[in-house]
């Protein structure tokens, strides 16, 4: 990689890569902490509905007050300072900004911002994987047609997994499985923002509950975030979901090749070429030692006896047969390494993972028995969790995407564990996110095309 030298060239030329950030939550704040220190990068503006929170987060990230005191976008461009605003569209329309980072985490907002960014001829880094799971394949197609880059966010696990897959294939290996680790027990699918504290207090040292958004955090616990992220990976790499989605097998870092291989070879997978998320908890509640809860991995196959001998000779974490090996990254640095995506988009016009087809979906699935006329509360809430589902199944059965299961009313009773359908809810067909999703379903009516 030579991104650093390319950034230095832009710095020396007085033409830093110009960035607009929409959404200053945890991911955005982590990006800001490193962006200020990156030569050749200029965050021209930051947009957040809560301007005072945005200013507070900039200060938290180590920015001196004078650095984000620009009175306008024009002033920020000229003074190499940063403008803070509540108007995201102003960033998108600003002719001097090259790259938009969408980090709101709200599917509807992300889709709208992506469409407008593409329309204005700018690259977009989609931190908002929730929006990508709803309509990413169509947004990426529109971006390619417009000659701009739509990309997943480096530092988040999906983009890192895509890099693992690309590395393996570029080296001539067959990819058996790829994914990440998490903390999982089967009953977590029923967790909600009230009882998630039982899990968080047990495993995290939380001294200030006010610093935690329980609904957001619960989306990681109940399996939704895993389904969303593995859907992003499938749609970007050509890997596919298993028929029933993720099974979360327990595994240490050193057992990845043994566990994440096909059942026909003694593993847990339905077939090869799939995504899977390993658990850091055994089914009896014991912690898995040397787990991969914050990391990512890929399992590859040695297709020759010589390659398999090399797996063993160089301790490449092979399975017992020696046929499969694993590579893993123990951590992901979230927004701290997001600058890789920004630089890659602006300087090499290259995505760090981008959808190439509609292979996987995330179906809204009932956490409990739901009653007609209940209002669904979306990701991490009390009503539904997101189950990874093959796109062809979702299309054929009309599943309701998890990202749009927010503030819609049920038309019928739904049993716990049942995947919801479009026909089960009252929705506004003119809503932009709904319209774009429906457009994508029509465009990809034949899966993987």
Tell what function each PLM region has.
Residues 143-144, 151-221:
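Rossmann-like NAD(P)H-binding beta-loop-alpha module
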Residues 123-125:
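A short hydrophobic/small-residue beta-strand
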Residues 2-8, 202-449:
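C-terminal catalytic/substrate-binding lobe primarily of soluble NAD(P)-dependent oxidoreductases
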């Amino acid at each position: 990689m030579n991104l650093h030298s390319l950034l230095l060239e832009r710095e020396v030329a007085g033409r830093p890569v110009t960035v607009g950030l929409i959404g200053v939550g945890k991911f955005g704040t982590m990006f800001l902490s490193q962006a200020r220190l990156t030569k050749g990068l200029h965050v021209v503006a930051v947009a957040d509905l809560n301007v005072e929170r945005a200013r507070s987060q900039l200060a938290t990230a180590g920015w001196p007050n004078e650095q984000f005191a620009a009175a306008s976008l024009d002033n920020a461009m000229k003074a190499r300072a940063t403008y803070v605003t509540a108007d995201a569209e102003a960033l998108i329309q600003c002719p001097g900004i090259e790259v938009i980072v969408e980090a709101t985490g709200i599917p509807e907002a992300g889709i709208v911002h992506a469409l407008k960014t593409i329309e204005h001829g700018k690259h977009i880094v989609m931190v908002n994987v929730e929006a990508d799971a709803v309509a990413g394949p169509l947004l990426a197609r529109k971006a390619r047609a417009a000659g701009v880059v739509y990309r997943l966010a480096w530092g988040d696990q999906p983009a890192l997994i895509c890099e693992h897959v690309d590395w393996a294939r570029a080296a001539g290996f067959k990819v058996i499985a790829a994914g990440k680790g998490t903390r999982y027990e089967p009953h977590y699918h029923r967790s909600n923002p009230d009882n998630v504290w039982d899990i968080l207090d047990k495993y995290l040292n939380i001294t200030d509950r006010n610093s935690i958004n329980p609904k957001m955090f619960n989306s990681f616990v109940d399996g939704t975030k895993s389904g969303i992220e593995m859907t992003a990976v499938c749609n970007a790499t050509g890997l596919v979901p298993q028929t029933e989605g993720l099974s979360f097998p327990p595994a240490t870092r050193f057992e990845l090749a043994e566990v994440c291989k096909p059942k026909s070879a003694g593993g847990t997978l339905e077939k090869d070429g799939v995504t899977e998320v390993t658990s850091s908890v055994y089914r009896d509640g014991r912690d898995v030692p040397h787990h991969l809860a914050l990391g990512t991995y890929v399992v590859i196959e040695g297709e020759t006896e010589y390659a398999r001998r090399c797996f063993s000779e160089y301790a490449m974490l092979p399975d017992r047969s020696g046929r499969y090996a694993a590579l893993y990254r123990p951590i992901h640095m979230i927004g701290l390494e997001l600058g890789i995506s920004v630089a890659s988009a602006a300087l090499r016009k290259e995505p760090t993972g981008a959808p190439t087809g509609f292979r996987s979906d995330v179906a809204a699935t009932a956490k409990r028995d739901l009653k007609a006329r209940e209002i669904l509360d979306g990701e991490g809430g009390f009503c539904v969790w997101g189950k990874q589902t093959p796109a062809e199944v979702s299309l054929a059965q009309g599943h309701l995407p998890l990202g749009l299961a927010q503030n819609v009313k049920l038309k019928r009773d739904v049993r716990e564990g049942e995947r919801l359908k479009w026909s089960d809810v009252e929705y506004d067909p003119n809503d932009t996110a709904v319209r774009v999703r429906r457009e994508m379903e029509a465009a990809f009516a034949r899966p993987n095309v």
